[in-house]
């Protein structure tokens, strides 16, 4: 309640909701935004996205219900609950992954495919090789998207710095302002401790 105003014997209440957050796909046509719903309709891609959101919400609600049942089951030990919850989590993420893969296959060059590709590239355990396989399924428009190129660049950096991989050489300056490279020290037959200090 923001305020109440009395005027001419009537009391009027002004209520300003805190915030609305409704995403939509900008496309030609009349986009209908129902603020009580989780999506928009009225245009082809927005209507498809809203339907997919409803399906996912139902799936998520089912998974949450099953999770609460496991947590409340007094006949299961803590270890058995942990195993059951992990199995449920694995099933849930496998389903989400398969739905996103299907969305990318059906929509390789539009906003629904972009959302699916972002979801897939953000999943735990994604590797550069699996990301590149996903990019092969995506259209040029999706592959050129700035967010997608940033996600793939991050995966490239992660792969380049994996434990056991050849170090990534870089240059800095020492206390005497002399240029030094990591390769000046690494690979000389001794242990090297590198301390990064940012000020």
Walk through the language-model features, giving the residues of each:
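A non-transmembrane, solvent-exposed segment enriched in polar/low-complexity residues
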Residues: 1-98
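Conserved hydrophobic/aromatic pocket- or pore-lining residues that grip, position, or stack substrates
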Residues: 116, 170, 194
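N-terminal targeting signals for export/organelle localization
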Residues: 11-21, 31-32, 42-46, 82, ...
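N-terminal "domain-start" segment that seeds a small globular fold
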Residues: 149-187
